[in-house]
Amino acid sequence: METGLDCLRLGQKGTVLEINTDQSLRGRLQAFGLIPGTLVCCRYRTPGGSVTALEFRGTVIALRTRDMQKIRVRCL
């Protein structure tokens, strides 16, 4: 199933299909190694749900929900 990265449940994994963010954010994500084909896991979500910690390639980063909505993944 394909969905936005923001729809992954805690502990769920997905493979990045495309990143439709602005150029600046896309460049920062690519520098961390978040590119199409990357396996990503949802690790933590703040109580309000506005920020989520994601783990991929041995790295953990936090992204805002509005940015995650622009990243398409295939759920595993």
Predicted regions and their residues:
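Compact, glycine-rich, soluble single-domain proteins
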Residues: 1-76
